[in-house]
């Protein structure tokens, strides 16, 4: 029988960090209170969001659609990247997944996930 007090596996939350997200501050308070282990952020690289999550060991992966956004996210403190390449749903990029990964790996050796055209 499952024990509800024992975590089954790491989980993550998606946080849209664009300034138009009026729930972000409250959602982050709840996530930090419960020490969410992994965040996937999108639509803006915000240092204060990364700092809040990392204050207890949380990991932040940021959705990016090109190399410029990747560099911005890492410079603001993201731990890793989700490369949303051509063929992905939602706010997809226009670059081939193989080209995008290669561009990013030229300067970044941290966690890198790929989304789209797989």
Model-predicted regions and their roles:
Residues 115-118:
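A short glycine-centered flexible hinge/capping loop motif at secondary-structure junctions
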Residues 1-113:
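Active-site entrance/lid segments in N-terminal catalytic domains of soluble metabolic enzymes
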């Amino acid at each position: 029988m499952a024990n509800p007090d024992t975590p089954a596996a790491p989980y993550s939350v998606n946080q849209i960090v664009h300034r138009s997200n009026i729930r972000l501050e409250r959602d982050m308070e709840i996530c930090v209170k419960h020490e969410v282990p992994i965040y996937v952020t999108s639509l803006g690289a915000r240092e204060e969001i990364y700092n809040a999550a990392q204050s207890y060991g949380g990991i932040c992966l940021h959705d990016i659609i090109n190399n410029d956004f990747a560099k911005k996210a890492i410079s603001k403190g993201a731990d890793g990247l989700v490369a949303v390449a051509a063929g992905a749903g939602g706010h997809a990029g226009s670059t081939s997944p193989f080209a995008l990964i290669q561009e990013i790996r030229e300067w970044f050796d941290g966690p890198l996930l790929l989304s789209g055209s797989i």
